[in-house]
Regions:
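Bacterial N-terminal signal peptides that target proteins for export
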Residues: 1-11
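C-terminal PAP-associated
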Residues: 25-523
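Bacterial N-terminal signal peptides
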Residues: 9-21
Length: 523
């Protein structure tokens, strides 16, 4: 494949200093998880352009080789415009249209290390130039068992205001922006990259299974791509999210909004479209070609959109989600949590019901919800072993199956946040040696937060906690916060020696991507 050379800003290779030499330490009291057990520092972003929603992967062939990507959005537009409230007012709508029409307003920043995080090289995507689009947002990264690194994004909005030729909805999102999600591959540890390849291009119904009716409006059905890898088979998957049309539904044309200039349309009302899905596509040749697009739920057992988990190992694509419809012949009462296994890249699933959490583990009152979807991880060392994590108030409980979902262990307490805190940015993954790791942000009532990690070395029976953040992050800073978009997730990876975390943090005075590293010996 044709290669392009990663652009290194000023050919920079930097030596990162300990955090204490960069930022004054907080006077926080001692907390579980000694600060000295983790290493952390600001990696991506600056006062002009933030960096959020980061991804981290290590190279299985060379664990000292890691890639981090982040969505890097201008904090102030070239004309000096700063963020305003994102609401449905006329002015906010017009401001959003203006923001999205700025070329290179959002890009994917890339950091690569080949010495375990001592030094890094920095570059940015070439997707915007290659496809002639404004933005490379919703960044992601990945790594394959053959040592290949991957990076990609949602590359969209025809250059300048071209993405708005088909109009926009109230709120400012283009109806037909152009673009989609794309991926590039590196076979030399991130030194050079292939040209990007479309995975979920917009307006491409021919790529979907014939029984699916995806709704092609705005960035649906390709929003927020996520990368999944089956290390035993080398299969890689990329997801996208968005709406769908009911079986017999006919989508009516958008209706002009009289409060907006020509080209501005009313938002669609609830019920005008069908359900919301996570769409998934598989590649068996390292991202060169891709198969038919399916969903992570099914017509027989529909999900609720966001909130489910996806993982893969030993040729099994596995999903977990909440449904209101019990699988056929299950005799279950729903809403319930289902576990699905696909042997054909998501074309079809076999389902099993996961027992509900016992009543004595549930809080007496719901309290603050936080982000409480079910997490799922497949163990690459043992076929049929999977872990799920469920939130019950201030606690997370983990259950394990050793037989492909037929039976599940009793829930084990894995994490707990303070009484007034909620969970955010949760993640869970197995290491190549079968060690189970988890991360989460603990978010406090004043919107400050810190990052935590948890590890089980005995198959999910006992857990040990290490605080990754050395201090609590200030709350979101609107004028230096990725233009008020770009903090939907944090991610982790776990090798045989270290747990790695990347997350958006505001301690530097802007939303930047911070990198954390914890030796497994610390747990």
């Amino acid at each position: 494949m044709k290669q392009f050379r990663a652009y290194l800003a000023f050919a920079t290779v930097v030596m990162l200093l300990p955090l204490g030499q960069l930022i004054a330490q907080s006077s926080l009291p001692a907390l579980p998880g000694d600060n000295a057990k983790s290493d952390e520092y600001l990696l991506l972003g600056n006062a002009d352009r933030g960096a959020g929603e980061p991804w981290v992967f290590f190279n299985p062939r060379d664990p000292n080789n890691l890639i981090v990507t982040a969505m890097a959005t201008l904090n102030v537009l070239p004309d000096g415009e700063t963020p305003v409230a994102h609401d449905n007012s006329v002015q906010a709508t017009l401001n959003r249209v203006h923001e999205l029409s700025v070329p290179d307003g959002s890009r994917t920043d890339i950091a690569v290390t080949r010495d375990g995080g001592k030094t890094w090289t920095f570059s940015e995507d070439n997707f915007r130039k290659f496809y002639n689009k404004n933005r490379c947002s919703d960044s992601f990264a990945g790594a394959g068992p053959d040592g290949a690194l991957y990076m990609g994004c949602l590359v969209y909005l025809d250059r300048g205001d071209g993405g708005f030729k088909g109009g926009y909805f109230r709120g400012g999102e283009a109806i037909n922006p152009g673009g989609g999600s794309a991926i590039a591959r590196s076979d030399d540890e991130g030194k050079t990259w292939s040209n990007p390849v479309w995975v979920h291009p917009l307006k491409s119904p021919e790529l979907y299974a014939p029984w699916l009716r995806p709704l092609f409006e705005q960035v649906g059905p390709v929003d927020r791509p996520n990368f999944i890898v089956d290390a035993s088979k080398g299969t890689i998957y990329l997801t996208g999210t968005g709406g769908s049309l009911g079986k017999d539904a006919v989508l009516a044309p958008p209706v002009h909004d009289p409060e907006l200039p020509d080209g501005g349309y009313k938002r669609r009302e609830a019920g005008q479209t069908g359900g919301f899905h996570t769409y998934i596509r598989a590649s068996h040749d390292g991202g060169k070609t891709w198969g038919i697009i399916y969903t992570t739920d099914s017509e027989q057992v529909p999900g609720r959109g966001f909130g489910g988990g996806v993982s893969a190992a030993f040729g099994h694509l596995v999903v977990v989600y909440t449904t209101d419809t019990a699988p056929p012949s299950s005799n279950a009462t729903c809403p319930c949590t289902v576990f699905g296994i696909s042997e054909n890249d998501g074309k079809s699933y076999s389902y099993k019901i996961i027992p509900a959490l016992p009543a004595n583990l549930l809080p007496p009152s719901p309290g603050p919800a936080g982000r409480a979807g079910v997490l799922l991880a497949a163990d690459p060392t043992k076929e049929g072993r999977y872990a799920i994590a469920r939130t019950a108030g201030r606690r997370q409980y983990v259950s394990i199956t050793e037989d492909g979902g037929n039976t599940w262990s009793a829930p084990v307490l894995a994490t707990e946040v303070p009484e007034t805190a909620t969970y955010s940015h949760r993640g869970m993954k197995y290491s190549p040696a079968g060690v189970l790791g988890m991360i989460y942000k603990a978010q406090y009532p004043d919107r400050t937060f810190d990052m935590w990690s948890v590890v089980s070395k005995d198959g999910g029976h006992n857990f040990s906690t290490v605080r990754v953040s050395h201090a609590v992050s200030p709350a979101y800073i609107p004028v230096r916060g990725n233009f008020m978009y770009g903090d939907d997730l944090s991610t982790m990876d776990i090798s045989r020696e270290y747990l790695y975390v990347v997350w958006g943090d505001n301690r530097s005075g802007f939303e930047g991507t911070w990198f954390g590293k914890v030796p497994l010996s610390a747990y």
